[in-house]
Amino acid sequence: MPRIKHGDTTYGTTYQEQTKALRRYFIREYRTMCEEFSRTHNPYFRSLLIRNYIYKGPILEWYMRVKCRMDGYYDVYDRLIPRDATITDVGAGNAQMDFMLANLAPERTIYAIDYDEGKIEVARNSFLGRRTGVQFMCGDMCTIEFPKSDYILFSDSLHYIDSERQKSVLERAIESLNEGGCIVVRDGNASHGHAHNLIELTELWSTKLLKFNKTTTDLCFVSEEWMRRFAVEHNMDIEISQYWRYSSETLYILKTRR
């Protein structure tokens, strides 16, 4: 801020006017600074997220380091979702994405839902679980009631249920959206052929070998065509983009029409 010279009336003529004007100036500049530095590229937030899992066992810590790096520390979600939005993350796992979104914008209201009670307990009782205000719910996505939200997220979670239940879950999610809300689905695209093989292999490794993720049925991945049909049937706009260039990971953004 430039030095204010004696007699300068830029910020008012009285001490009261100057005090109020300068307060507004610092608030405005602080918000600008937060917009620049409260992003996933800031090493502070990356380190804070990973350190949240260092006393939860070597496998979980290693998994988080790899997973968060592969997911770009959730920069796509941070830039997509407004900083005052209400968010429900269905299939939150250990809530790493929710913690990042909450750290970057504390004014967000976030609900983290997962079927695995163990993961919910680990997340709830972690440092960030107590610090960020993320609200945890343990339950099956097919039966649990979703909170009213601006954004409902399904990140690599829909493929744990069959096609019929996928449709039912998404329909219930639509009913839980606030006006102008969005459903964001990130999952492997079954129609991508060879590129989809990597996703299937990693899920096999995760569910059958390491038993890191719980599943009671065979995996069922949606396709781009399936998602487009669903959007048309429910009068929603849809945006589709490739999430990770090395596999079939695809981002589907379903928007309610006003």
List the predicted regions and their residue ranges.
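N-terminal, positively charged/glycine-rich alpha-helical extensions of SAM-dependent methyltransferases
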Residues: 2-57
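C-terminal alpha-helical "lid/dimerization" subdomain adjacent to the S-adenosyl-L-methionine
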Residues: 186-230, 241-242
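Conserved alpha-helix/loop element of class I SAM-dependent methyltransferases that forms part
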Residues: 67-83
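Conserved glycine-rich SAM-binding loop
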Residues: 93
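A conserved beta-strand element that flanks and buttresses the S-adenosyl-L-methionine
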Residues: 153
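Class I SAM-dependent methyltransferase SAM/SAH-binding core
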Residues: 96, 100-132
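Conserved SAM-binding strand-loop segment of SAM-dependent methyltransferases
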Residues: 130-141
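A short glycine-rich, Lys/Arg-flanked "PGG" loop and its adjoining helix->strand segment in the class I
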Residues: 167-179
